[in-house]
């Protein structure tokens, strides 16, 4: 897969009322708000534009101090981050063919090369959306519901995403929780690329049963019959920050750099 740089913009959905870590975007990481860390990582990619989409004035005010980062004040009724970014795309006035990379607001260590790679993957595929995955080699990750797993077809497209360990090894997991060489098991990296036009189509899709059960917005795309291209990336993506424990680990990782 070519990793040539293609034009793209980065949009970061950010909401204050995260259930597992309230006020997450403004939590301090290395003495600075988490949203600052994520936005500056986006700026380092060479993106044409970087936007933060939020419905909270506290987040908007925090981002306003960052040079080169735009803020879109969005409605507080959106069901998912992608719905929020669709409104951001309208506010920004992006043409339908503009490649939009959805960088989650809890990914302060996302490698710039990986962000560029997901844009390139969309450009070179016939899928409606592109995303990244990395292999799982730790049992604690495989069975952690906060780490999303996925399975792909032989064409490198997603078949399903789940918080459960998929595929389930019927013979092995009955007696042990250790991954086996029959994998690889894949961890989904919460990084997406699609064009601005598809973002608008996404808002017309009704959340399906699978999305509601798993609480995973990408399942809406699959349930509606669209395709998601997947690249297994060699770049190291630390897990996102979802809990106070994750934040403590991120703080330690920052200190060790």
Swiss-Prot record:
Its main location: cytoplasm. GO terms for molecular function: 3-deoxy-manno-octulosonate cytidylyltransferase activity. Its EC number is 2.7.7.38. It is found in: Cytoplasm. It comes from the Bacteria. Pathway: Nucleotide-sugar biosynthesis; CMP-3-deoxy-D-manno-octulosonate biosynthesis; CMP-3-deoxy-D-manno-octulosonate from 3-deoxy-D-manno-octulosonate and CTP: step 1/1; Bacterial outer membrane biogenesis; lipopolysaccharide biosynthesis. It catalyses: 3-deoxy-alpha-D-manno-oct-2-ulosonate + CTP = CMP-3-deoxy-beta-D-manno-octulosonate + diphosphate. One of its GO terms (biological process) is CMP-keto-3-deoxy-D-manno-octulosonic acid biosynthetic process. The gene is kdsB. Gene3D superfamilies: Spore Coat Polysaccharide Biosynthesis Protein SpsA, Chain A. One of its GO terms (cellular component) is cytosol. Activates KDO (a required 8-carbon sugar) for incorporation into bacterial lipopolysaccharide in Gram-negative bacteria. PANTHER family: 3-DEOXY-MANNO-OCTULOSONATE CYTIDYLYLTRANSFERASE (PTHR42866), 3-DEOXY-MANNO-OCTULOSONATE CYTIDYLYLTRANSFERASE, MITOCHONDRIAL (PTHR42866:SF2). It comes from Xylella fastidiosa (strain M23). Disulfide bonds: none annotated. Keywords: Cytoplasm, Lipopolysaccharide biosynthesis, Nucleotidyltransferase, Transferase. This is 3-deoxy-manno-octulosonate cytidylyltransferase. NCBIfam families: kdsB, PRK05450.1-5. Belongs to the KdsB family.
């Amino acid at each position: 897969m070519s990793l040539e740089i293609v034009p793209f913009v980065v949009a970061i959905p950010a909401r204050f009322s995260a259930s597992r870590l309230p006020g997450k975007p403004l939590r301090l990481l290395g003495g600075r708000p988490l949203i600052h860390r994520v936005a500056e990582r986006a700026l380092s990619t060479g993106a044409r534009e970087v936007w933060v989409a939020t419905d909270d004035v506290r987040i908007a005010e925090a981002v306003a101090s960052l040079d080169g980062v735009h803020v879109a004040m969005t409605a507080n009724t959106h069901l998912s981050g992608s719905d929020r970014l669709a409104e951001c795309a309208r506010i920004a006035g992006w043409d339908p063919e503009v490649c939009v990379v959805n960088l989650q607001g809890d990914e302060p260590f996302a490698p710039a090369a990986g962000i560029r790679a997901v844009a390139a993957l969309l450009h070179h595929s016939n899928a409606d959306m592109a995303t990244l995955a990395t292999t799982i080699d730790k049992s604690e990750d495989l069975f952690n519901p906060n780490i999303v797993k996925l399975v792909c077809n032989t064409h490198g497209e997603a078949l399903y995403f789940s918080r459960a360990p998929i595929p389930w090894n019927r013979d092995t997991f009955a007696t042990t929780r250790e991954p086996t060489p029959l994998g690889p098991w894949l961890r989904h990296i919460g990084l997406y690329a699609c064009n601005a036009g598809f973002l608008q189509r996404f808002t017309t899709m009704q959340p399906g049963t699978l999305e509601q059960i798993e609480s995973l917005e990408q399942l809406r795309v699959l349930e509606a019959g669209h395709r998601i291209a997947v690249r297994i990336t060699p770049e190291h993506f630390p897990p996102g920050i979802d809990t106070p424990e994750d934040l403590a680990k991120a703080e330690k990782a920052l200190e060790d750099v």
